[in-house]
Amino acid sequence: LMMGEIKTTKVDKENMKGEYKLKVENINFENIHSNVPTLNDISLKIKSGEILGIAGVSGNGQVELANIISGIERNYQGKVIVNGKNISNQGVRSRKNLNLSYIPENRLGVGLAPGVSIIDNSAVKDYFKSRLGPHLSSTKMLDYLNTLIKQFSIKAPDPRAEVSTLSGGNMQKLLMGRELVSNPEVIIAAQPTRGLDVSAVESLHELIINQRDNGAAIMLISEDLDELFKLSDRIIVLYEGEIVKEFDIDNANINNVGLAMAGSLE
């Protein structure tokens, strides 16, 4: 196994039945700038080897929910529980140490650091320090980046160029590769394939499925219903900060999900 290569191992889902990796309980959040409730009493659970799709038109609380689970947003009420541990008072780094990865919609800023080179953005320093020791050589970092470039078909002619020189699609590939390399147990992915070409979308869908088959609990936030229906086991619809409907994928109808997203489904 090469450094940085994602190892996937098929898991026996029946033996994991009922094992919830992520629980969100009674989350309430109010935007301090508008004093408008953004999330109202949100509760959900995701099992190992399960993909929960979050559907909703932009602006209905999906980003805020992802930021709360990942630890970026700390000013909320309710509980976030990973592997049975209440992590509500913990920050981003502590949550990453519990094997929770966040692939944000905002690639530059939240995901990748603007003004920083591609190679520095690619190196998950905490991850490598825990495995390779505190002294990271530029050679090790470059080897790792080359592994990501090959594995995720990233077009990065100059690894020392600023990350902003990459196309949006290649930024997303870099970000996803960096977050998935440690085989996280819980993955929060917000619009992970937006801006990618068809070939890249198929490649990243396969990666998401492999992570699910490897036992990860995955929350997939997307406005693309075709994507949600292809990948999800269940779909929850957020409308005006509330869960208005939950669908099991085997019994879901794409038109009804669309109506729920518009607030029109009784």
Q: For the regions a protein language model found, what residue spans apply to each?
A:
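Glycine-rich phosphate-binding loops of nucleotide-dependent enzymes
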Residues: 1-266
